[in-house]
Amino acid sequence: MAKVIGIDLGTTNSCVAVMDGKDTKVIENAEGARTTPSMVAFSDDGERLVGQPAKRQAVTNPTNTLFAVKRLIGRRYEDPTVEKDKALVPFEIVKGDNGDAWVKAQDKNYSPSQISAMILQKMKETAESYLGEKVEKAVITVPAYFNDAQRQATKDAGRIAGLDVLRIINEPTAAALAYGLDKKEGKTIAVYDLGGGTFDISVLEIGDGVFEVKSTNGDTFLGGEDFDMRLVEYLAGEFKKDQGIDLKNDKLALQRLKEAAEKAKIELSSSQQTEINLPFITADASGPKHLTLKLTRAKFESLVDDLVQRTVAPCKAALKDAGVTAAEIDEVVLVGGMSRMPKVQEVVKQLFGKEPHKGVNPDEVVAMGAAIQAGVLQGDVKDVLLLDVTPLSLGIETLGGVFTRLIDRNTTIPTKKSQTFSTAEDNQSAVTIRVSQGEREMAQDNKLLGQFDLVGLPPSPRGVPQIEVTFDIDANGIVQVSAKDKGTGKEQQIRIQASGGLSDADIEKMVKDAEANAEADKKRRAGVEAKNQAESLIHSTEKSVKEYGDKVSETDRKAIEDAIASLKTAVEAAEPDADDIQAKTQTLMEVSMKLGQAIYEAQQAEAGDASAEGKDDVVDADYEEIKDDKKSA
């Protein structure tokens, strides 16, 4: 039975894990690392790089290296948070055909789902090379506070990557699964998850295989990226004060600042001071300029204090919704790379009145939880019951633009709820059902998930028709809504697709693009491997011809030299053809056989001479036989 993998699709890094017997195994990627940077780059020659190779060339190719794209997934281009991001990233954020925020690289527009799919493909390949078999099914994690549009876009990314996404699971819930799988006694825990781009807090009751989420809260635009950007702004500001040059206008300098900020942030978690040193960051008429600056932990903490404090209100709201006090929380589990920051740990300690639990790896625990959920769905992990909740209230717009809730936030899912509404005007023949998600009282202040019409209502006075609206949320947190006229039995239903979102046709096209890209990547890799093998053979054959060329006939030697020349031409072609290189490699190997034979014979002869010389040097030794009785004396 094919394995189901668990993938933590992170803003900054991604991770893949699988159930190995009763244990979870985090799988190392081709570069030997357990996490993969969530980065995709496009080079000038059309090559696509994912993960560490993309990160390595980011400084020299900033406008075509895409990172933190998860922050844009399922968001409209006009979203204020997108506006903020546009000013701080070196690549271009553009308006997609559907009104969503997309990204641009090498003059081509990509949806965030497409870029996420490329990262998922990399995780899929990582798992396949470890398992030695094809992987087609996965459980993918999302921030608990993701809305329906963001969840749907993540599911679309999985589909584009060629994965059947069996379940979308909330990151803090996954972390709780990994933390509490072997814990029998009942506990109330809080999972504080501050990652690269999002913040979640979930309160759960766990024990004896049951994981019940009591409440969840968070901020989908708060994470390590914001801490980095705050530091980038500070560094650019200091440099401008000192040199009068604004580095934010220089994409290359901006990318170098971003890398330096991330490095400094990490260093300051374990040391009190770090030095940021960026030589030749820019130049003006007077010559090159260098950025050198000492940064203390205290200064960094003062720069980001408001960001850390932004995690407090969601924590308090989650405790209130769960009906527990901070003192009733038995353990606070820290998840996400940013939870390593001492200031964050200090705030958590003050808030919950106890030292947070640091016994899980914050970068890997979410993927491990996803793998456990995959094991549950596959039947490999028994006696585990996971009860998650919907993070935001769901409802429809009613008369006067009021948001009428049908399902309150923190309702256990899957769930289904119906309510009967009527018309607002006489002889109304159709009603528009506008579905929103959020906590504000007016519909326009919440996230519009989608709308549809129920038509063909018989003419009646206002308030007479009985229209039953039903909300159905599945275990992935994805919504389906139906409206039924009780009088006529007419029914209309939709799976909510964000007002932007990707249509099935869009997804199909992207799936085909992804498959074509995977094929092109495979071809490119085969070309590189064939080229490496050919170059190695050329080098060794040329060396052999130089040393032993006189041992073969002139005709054989010329045939070898011609084959080398032909293979060199194939290797040096602008677009190396793997098949052509392999064929010419084979030819060179065949014509070199006589040379190989000659080398072998020459070496045999040398070995024979050496052993003959050795015999001449043998000296006969005198020896005396000792009798047994002498030996024992």
UniProtKB/Swiss-Prot annotation:
PROSITE patterns: HSP70_1 (PS00297), HSP70_2 (PS00329), HSP70_3 (PS01036)
Residues modified as Phosphothreonine: 198
A UniProt-annotated Pfam family: HSP70
InterPro entries associated with the record: ATPase_NBD, Chaperone_DnaK, Heat_shock_70_CS, HSP70_C_sf, HSP70_peptide-bd_sf, Hsp_70_fam
Domain of life assignment: Bacteria
Sorted UniProt keywords: ATP-binding, Chaperone, Nucleotide-binding, Phosphoprotein, Stress response
Alphabetical list of PANTHER family matching this protein: HEAT SHOCK PROTEIN 70KDA
The name this protein goes by in its record: Chaperone protein DnaK
